[in-house]
Amino acid sequence: MQVDLLSSAQSAHALHLFHQHSPLVHCMTNDVVQTFTANTLLALGASPAMVIETEEASQFAAIASALLINVGTLTQPRAQAMRAAVEQAKRSQTPWTLDPVAVGALDYRRCFCLELLSHKPTAIRGNASEIMALAGIANGGRGVDTTDAAANAIPAAQTLARETGAIVVVTGEVDYVTDGHRIIGIHGGDPLMTKVVGTGCALSAVVAACCALPGDMLENVASACHWMKQAGERAVARSEGPGSFVPHFLDALWQLTPEVQA
């Protein structure tokens, strides 16, 4: 199994495209992370929108550059709105990303996420336990936390990618991004990133934005992982703990440039 690395030139090119296109991302995400997710997108140069009313969600999915479905605080009314948005995204050919939070631990969301897979997400982003559960290989995870190493989920990610046509992202100490055939590994980041609520969910929003960019989608999505890890490293160097990490992280995202990547 060959795992390629993302080059600086590839990351720089993707960031140039990101700044050039400034994707409008329709974030149907969980209540805990909405502000952090929006600020992450803004810091990178995208435009976030949090539209959750069923009728509006369907309408907005046709307008947005990309759609994010994050099931972290799933309710039946929210599931109805998400379903409507995904169906409209499919009709409008709007790329959409699924973040199957805690899918291996809870039955209702697992059934809902499996239903959504039939609508062929453009990308799927989760931790190892979530990706393995979604692929039907194992049920695991401790709530939103993974109990598996990211590398162990690569076969599940490849299977899921081939079955759905999605780019699948497994996040962990090393992130792995695959289209079912190619695999890109992204090293970096810092353990402190796991002590702040929302870094993974925010990454899913950036992944969604990158799905709206032209060019090589696998490389664009892998670049999203690289930017977040890079910003995390820079933020940790300036932080004293989780409380000071968040503003430094947003600043680091803001300061990323294609020239720095290259």
UniProtKB/Swiss-Prot annotation:
**Where does the source fall among the domains of life?**
Bacteria
Pfam families found in the cross-reference section: HK
What EC number(s) would the UniProt record show? 2.7.1.50
Keyword Kinase assigned to the entry: answer is: yes
Disulfide bonds, which pairs? none
Substrates-to-products reaction catalysed: 5-(2-hydroxyethyl)-4-methylthiazole + ATP = 4-methyl-5-(2-phosphooxyethyl)-thiazole + ADP + H(+)
- What cofactors does this protein use? Mg(2+)
Pathway terms, separated by semicolons = Cofactor biosynthesis; thiamine diphosphate biosynthesis; 4-methyl-5-(2-phosphoethyl)-thiazole from 5-(2-hydroxyethyl)-4-methylthiazole: step 1/1
Gene Ontology molecular function, alphabetical: ATP binding; hydroxyethylthiazole kinase activity; magnesium ion binding
- Biological processes annotated in GO: thiamine biosynthetic process; thiamine diphosphate biosynthetic process
Q: Does the keyword Ribosomal protein apply?
A: no
- What does this gene product do? Catalyzes the phosphorylation of the hydroxyl group of 4-methyl-5-beta-hydroxyethylthiazole (THZ).
Q: What does the sequence similarity comment in the record state about its family?
A: Belongs to the Thz kinase family.
- The molecule here is called Hydroxyethylthiazole kinase
Q: Give the species this sequence originates from.
A: Escherichia coli O17:K52:H18 (strain UMN026 / ExPEC)
Gene that produces this protein = thiM
